[in-house]
């Protein structure tokens, strides 16, 4: 919320299992609750196709009062869902469908835009990366447990989504930071990058918050084999 208040974007890069989805749902719910009547709080969540309905299930479970819609169906049905999205509604779609439906979003302004598994836009030259950056949104947040998998250009692409120009053009970033840091092991270049991005990245590992996590509960459940599965020799 501090980043949003100051008109910055950010990366939530917590380790897997620390509840990034729930943190975002809580943030969206607070935005809806604290906004003035008639104020645009429309939100867009973009996620891998395999996680679309997981997002919907989590919203229904933890914030049942949060209006949310999965953009699904054929082209005509999806366009209707997008066109009729209210100013206090969360739309959930996949990267692939966003790319296909991009024109339908041109007349919508979003208060919040979330990209889950942000490594999907690590290659800034792909259509998917270009599509998410064309959405008009006031605040942008990226979720990923791996902000950098192989190259620093992946981090640049995510920040180009969050705050275009913050890490310069890619040509300047590559010349002044990426090449010196990677090819020539220039510690000054890496420190410069870390100093620039530190205020906008929240990353916690499980070991960092282990003392705050509840005890792990284990329960053994036995399921007998059915007759077709069980054969005596």
Q: What feature does the model see in each segment?
A:
Residues 1-185, 192-233:
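ASCE P-loop NTPase motor core, strongest for the SF2 helicase catalytic module
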